[in-house]
Amino acid sequence: MTENSTSAPAAKPKRAKASKKSTDHPKYSDMVVAAIQAEKNRAGSSRQSIQKYIKSHYKVGENADSQIKLSIKRLVTTGVLKQTKGVGASGSFRLAKSDEPKKSVAFKKTKKEIKKVATPKKASKPKKAASKAPTKKPKATPVKKAKKKLAATPKKAKKPKTVKAKPVKASKPKKAKPVKPKAKSSAKRAGKKK
């Protein structure tokens, strides 16, 4: 019974600590947005200036710098912030909310551009796929057809070849040789009859 009573109050202080942490300062993302709004720099505010503002205006823990970096990255990925200079968490950042009407137009333009850019890519990919596919299909299908036809076509194929070959090759010798002997024999027979 005593163990349960001691474990229950132990959980309460943890909740209290959590509530204290939440009451000390707002979310890091909110603080970053507030810092950028307070600076109102057209070129955008740097991460260092954002950190200075947050540390001076809010009670923040020791890991504030890493939390600010993470929140800046999240805000950039979600589209709340625009990165004007630099890469990642370094560089300068602006609020994208102030450019909402421009952003909506920009989004429409970018979507159209993406569609325009995507359609040629899609068109080129199917062309490549189509060019590859027909080459693959004829390679694969003729083999199958050839195998199936081999049973039937060899007879058909041999017949036309042999028929063409025999009349051309055999007709000349047969006609040439038999005609000559017939002519000779007929001449001999005619001579004998005379």
Swiss-Prot record:
ADP-ribosylated on Ser-104 in response to DNA damage. GO terms for biological process: chromosome condensation; negative regulation of DNA recombination; nucleosome assembly. Its main location: nucleus. The keyword DNA-binding applies. Residues 1-29, 84-194 are annotated as: Disordered. The modification Citrulline is found at residue 42. GO terms for cellular component: nucleosome; nucleus. GO terms for molecular function: double-stranded DNA binding; nucleosomal DNA binding; structural constituent of chromatin. Residues 105-194 have a biased composition (Basic residues). The modification N-acetylthreonine is found at residue 2. Histones H1 are necessary for the condensation of nucleosome chains into higher-order structures. The histones H1.0 are found in cells that are in terminal stages of differentiation or that have low rates of cell division. This is Histone H1.0. It comes from Pongo abelii.
